[in-house]
């Protein structure tokens, strides 16, 4: 099986062309591929398939390293846009891709960064899904040893955003893993810790469900900015500074689409027998 390794700001992906290859992977296959000692290693596996709709260019299936299929991955979609151009699967600069959650539009810019129309953020608890009685800008969640104040939103996948004063002091893995499986989130949740530098700049660390702390996460960057704008803390254009690099996010609020722009990197092509 041919594959390509790419990364978006340190968030690394294995991308598989299922347009020109017949690909059938089990959860066991995916977990093996994700192993950084015995397989290839990745944060997410992205399988690019032919479209199911004539209005779409490609369909993409997204898997975490634990073998679970997920709805969305913003950084991964940017890499997919570059991948389909690199492999000459399309010559378009505006590419329509469907995922399990939605249909997104990716635009390859002149500087080879990729801008993604992520759609409008979803704050309705029923649609996130988030087991809470009614929508609020800030929620209180109870853990065995502490009380958490957070914002909750979906960008095609659920996100819990926690505002912090100093991001270096946060125990991302212990707190992230405790919140990931909180009973209020039936599909588990991605947990982000946001430090606001000013109204146009934030710092972010992310604990991704089924993965752990990662260098970057596109949907988490979008979710953090959406929550910050919704709470009146941020302007509509924000630079999100993650350990792996910076993503630009723009959102005019309400039901407007949110846009994320960032760079991608090709690493290598490979072949593996399964």
Swiss-Prot record:
Its UniProt pathway annotation is: Amino-acid biosynthesis; L-lysine biosynthesis via DAP pathway; DL-2,6-diaminopimelate from LL-2,6-diaminopimelate: step 1/1
Q: Which InterPro entries match?
A: DAP_epimerase_AS, DAP_epimerase_DapF
Cystine crosslinks: none
Q: Which GO terms describe its molecular function?
A: diaminopimelate epimerase activity
One Pfam family it belongs to: DAP_epimerase
Annotated localization: Cytoplasm
Q: Where is this site: Important for dimerization?
A: 268
Annotated catalysed reactions: (2S,6S)-2,6-diaminopimelate = meso-2,6-diaminopimelate
The UniProt similarity line reads: Belongs to the diaminopimelate epimerase family.
Q: What does this protein do?
A: Catalyzes the stereoinversion of LL-2,6-diaminopimelate (L,L-DAP) to meso-diaminopimelate (meso-DAP), a precursor of L-lysine and an essential component of the bacterial peptidoglycan.
Quaternary organization: Homodimer.
Name of the protein this chain belongs to: Diaminopimelate epimerase
Species of origin reads: Blochmanniella pennsylvanica (strain BPEN)
């Amino acid at each position: 099986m041919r594959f390509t390794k790419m990364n978006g700001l340190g968030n690394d992906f294995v991308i598989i062309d299922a347009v020109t290859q017949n690909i059938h992977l089990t959860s066991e296959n995916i977990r093996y591929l994700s192993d950084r000692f015995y397989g290839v290693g990745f944060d997410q596996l992205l399988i690019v398939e032919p479209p199911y709709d004539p209005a779409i260019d490609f369909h993409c299936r997204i898997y975490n390293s634990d073998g679970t299929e997920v709805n969305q991955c913003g950084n991964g979609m940017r890499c997919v846009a570059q991948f389909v151009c690199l492999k000459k699967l399309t010559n378009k600069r505006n590419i329509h891709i469907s995922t399990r959650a939605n249909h997104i539009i990716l635009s390859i810019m002149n500087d080879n960064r990729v801008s993604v129309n992520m759609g409008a953020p979803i704050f309705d608890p029923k649609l996130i899904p988030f087991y809470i009685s009614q929508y609020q800008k800030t929620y209180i969640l109870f853990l065995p040893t502490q009380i958490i104040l957070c914002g909750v939103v979906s960008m095609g996948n659920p996100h819990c955003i926690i505002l912090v004063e100093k991001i270096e002091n946060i125990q991302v893995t212990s707190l992230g893993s405790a919140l990931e499986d909180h009973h209020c989130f039936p599909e588990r949740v991605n947990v982000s810790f946001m430090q606001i530098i000013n109204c146009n700049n934030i710092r972010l660390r992310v604990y991704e469900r089924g993965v752990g702390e990662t260098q970057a996460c596109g949907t988490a960057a979008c979710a953090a900015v959406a929550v910050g704008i919704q709470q009146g803390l941020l302007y509509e254009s924000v630079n999100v500074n993650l350990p792996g690099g910076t993503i630009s996010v723009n959102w005019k609020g309400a039901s407007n689409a949110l846009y994320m722009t960032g760079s991608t990197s090709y690493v290598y092509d490979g072949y593996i027998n399964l």
